[in-house]
Amino acid sequence: MGNSITDNWALMDSVFFAEHRFVGRGISGQTSAEMLVRFRQDVIGLSPEAVVIMAGTNDLAQNNGYIALENILGNIASMCELAKLHKIRPILCSVLPAYRFGWRQEVPAADRIIELNGMIERYARENGISYVDYHSALKDGRNGLPEKYSGDGVHPNPECYKIMEAIVLPVIDKKPAKKVAVRTGGAKKHSWDR
């Protein structure tokens, strides 16, 4: 689930998506609020085992006007809650590094991306959700996406997507630990202890 970064990924490396039976649900220019609106149709309706959510770039670029970081996180959290409610494992991704947004040069990017990523990572940790940190692996000295990985400083090229694939696959393949009820010392503390 994502924006043009997800959409382009499915187009540029369709073999990766086909080999792993992944479905790309990216729409160019979309914000987290717009992704949330289509989450039922594009994710829940497909009944996947997991959903990888990469959202926030277009919110930070102010495609639909200014939005507080807390509201972006709220939209992302709502997608996670919907996924969990439908027995779909959410996986959250960092926003990719960007020094500036080519279509919105006046909007500061790098520092707000870092701040939002911290919020996303904290939310994931506090809620037992896997977090994929693309930002740390891809950033340059200005906290942007290096030229060798992007023609415009925002959208990955095929080489960058290969790096992202190597980062996300182990997280997708890692199954969460199952919760197991353990009886200790014969104490009866739960309804199943009769």
Where are the language model's segments positioned?
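Loop/turn elements at helix/coil->beta-strand transitions in domains of secreted/extracellular proteins
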Residues: 19-21, 46-51, 84-91, 127-130
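Amphipathic, non-transmembrane alpha-helical secondary structure
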Residues: 33-44, 70-77, 81, 162, ...
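Conserved, well-ordered alpha-helix/loop/beta-strand core segments that scaffold catalytic motifs
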Residues: 51-56, 73-80, 84-93
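Sec-exported extracytoplasmic/periplasmic mature domains
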Residues: 40, 44, 56, 81-88, ...
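Charged helix-capping and loop-helix junction motifs
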Residues: 68-77, 110-116
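Catalytic His-Asp segment of secreted/periplasmic serine-dependent ester chemistry enzymes
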Residues: 96-194
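Serine-esterase "nucleophile elbow" of acetyl-processing enzymes
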Residues: 1-50, 162
